Amino acid sequence: MKWIKSTGSIGLSLLLFLSSFSHSLYAAPLRVISLSPSTTELAYAAGLGDNLIAASAYSDYPPQARKLEQVANWQGINLERIITLKPELILAWRGGNPQRPLEQLAAFGIKIFYSDPTTTEQIAQDLERLAEYSPHPEQAKKSATELRQRFANLQQQYATTTPKPAFLQFGTYPLFTTSGQTLQSEVLSICGGRNIFANSPVPWPQVSREQVLIRKPEIIVISGGQEQVKLIENFWHPQLRAKVITLHEDWFHRAGPRIILAAEQLCQQLNDNGS
């Protein structure tokens, strides 16, 4: 009886120790690395900001992201440095980050979270998926809910707007645009614009000046500072006298939660009294 009681006591102590050890492992902050500016913004919006130990070049929002060590840029990924930092989760941009080093990192047992949203709903879904890893899952879910609500408000506000033919201009020499299967085109559509290259089979086609002129856009959407407007107007004059709208570059280009700011900016300019 004493042996049973003693064994039970030891067993209970062991269970408590293991439980405590397991809890401490679970409570240890997850080490996260982001490999693109958009996934960095997603991480902060999902409550994972304090877990980030490194990020990519141009990860500059929110401002504290600028303090993170940079382990990736447009040239590639610093594989050796990432392994040295011992991350447990890597946030990757599918199609933007090279696949081979990501597969090598996965072979080390590192979890890879892929993000490549082409719709506003997919951004919200990415936030919800990140809730699984976040120490603040309610923040991730709240960010997703707020994003959906703000886009729903825009859709309701501009639902009866007569679509205006618009050219989404990315670059000048050469001219690039986007098809209807991208995040940027969806934002344009929500605001009451009609992408003149929506039917392109290529997501990001290079187009000619003549291809644009024949479609007669009333609106040209660009990104950058206000000083770009005059340059674009001069580029198209005298053959095309379309209204030029400029948007905050990071808001519009990054597939992250701040795309709503670009949408609100575009909707306002596209539907003001001067349009």
UniProtKB/Swiss-Prot annotation:
Gene3D superfamilies reported in the protein's UniProt record: Nitrogenase molybdenum iron protein domain
Signal peptide start-end: 1-27
SS bond partners: C191-C267
Main location: periplasm
Residues in Fe/B12 periplasmic-binding domain copies: 31-275
Gene Ontology annotations for the cellular component aspect, listed alphabetically: periplasmic space
GO molecular function, one term: cobalamin binding
Binding site for cyanocob(III)alamin: Y58
Subunit-level organization: The complex is composed of two ATP-binding proteins (BtuD), two transmembrane proteins (BtuC) and a solute-binding protein (BtuF).
Function according to Swiss-Prot or TrEMBL: Part of the ABC transporter complex BtuCDF involved in vitamin B12 import. Binds vitamin B12 and delivers it to the periplasmic surface of BtuC.
Protein name: Vitamin B12-binding protein
Organism: Photorhabdus laumondii subsp. laumondii (strain DSM 15139 / CIP 105565 / TT01)
UniProt lineage: Bacteria, Pseudomonadati, Pseudomonadota, Gammaproteobacteria, Enterobacterales
